[in-house]
From Swiss-Prot:
The nucleosome is a histone octamer containing two molecules each of H2A, H2B, H3 and H4 assembled in one H3-H4 heterotetramer and two H2A-H2B heterodimers. The octamer wraps approximately 147 bp of DNA. GO terms for cellular component: nucleosome; nucleus. Core component of nucleosome which plays a central role in DNA double strand break (DSB) repair. Nucleosomes wrap and compact DNA into chromatin, limiting DNA accessibility to the cellular machineries which require DNA as a template. Histones thereby play a central role in transcription regulation, DNA repair, DNA replication and chromosomal stability. DNA accessibility is regulated via a complex set of post-translational modifications of histones, also called histone code, and nucleosome remodeling. The lineage of its organism: Eukaryota, Fungi, Dikarya, Ascomycota, Pezizomycotina. This is Histone H2A. It comes from Aspergillus terreus (strain NIH 2624 / FGSC A1156).
Length: 131
C-alpha cells in the first residue's frame, strides 16, 4: 500500500486520550465542540470553550441530581422521578431563578396553601368557660 495508509490508527495515537478524560469530565467535550460549531453561535470556536461548557453542564447536572436524590430519599424512594426533580429545582432559590420558566413534565406543583385559606386560630381563655 502506498501513501502510508495501513488501515489502522495513526502511528502517533497509541496513547490516545479523549478531551473529556484529559479535563477529568464525564460530559463529552468533543460532542459539545461539534454542537457549538454546528449551532452557528459564532464563526469560530476556541479550544477551551467546549471544555468549559462541558464542565459547567456537568456541574449543573450533578447539583440538580444531588438535590433530586435528597428529595427522593425524603419521600422514601430509591428512584428519582420527575416529581423529585421539580421539588429539587423549585425549593432551591438559584436553580428556581435559572429554570423559572421551564415546565417539567409530570413534575406537579409545590404544596402551598395561601394563608387566608387556613382556618382562623381562636385564642383559648385560661379560665374555664363552663359554669
Amino acid at each position: 500500500m502506498t501513501g502510508g495508509k495501513s488501515g489502522g490508527k495513526a502511528s502517533g495515537s497509541k496513547n490516545a486520550q479523549s478531551r473529556s478524560s484529559k479535563a477529568g469530565l464525564a460530559f463529552p467535550v468533543g460532542r459539545v465542540h461539534r454542537l457549538l460549531r454546528k449551532g452557528n453561535y459564532a464563526q469560530r470556536v476556541g479550544a477551551g470553550a467546549p471544555v468549559y461548557l462541558a464542565a459547567v453542564l456537568e456541574y449543573l447536572a450533578a447539583e440538580i441530581l444531588e438535590l433530586a436524590g435528597n428529595a427522593a430519599r425524603d419521600n422514601k424512594k430509591t428512584r428519582i422521578i420527575p416529581r423529585h426533580l421539580q421539588l429539587a429545582i423549585r425549593n432551591d432559590e438559584e436553580l428556581n431563578k435559572l429554570l423559572g420558566h421551564v415546565t417539567i413534565a409530570q413534575g406537579g406543583v409545590l404544596p402551598n396553601i395561601h394563608q387566608n385559606l387556613l382556618p382562623k386560630k381562636t385564642p383559648k381563655a385560661k379560665g374555664s368557660q363552663e359554669l
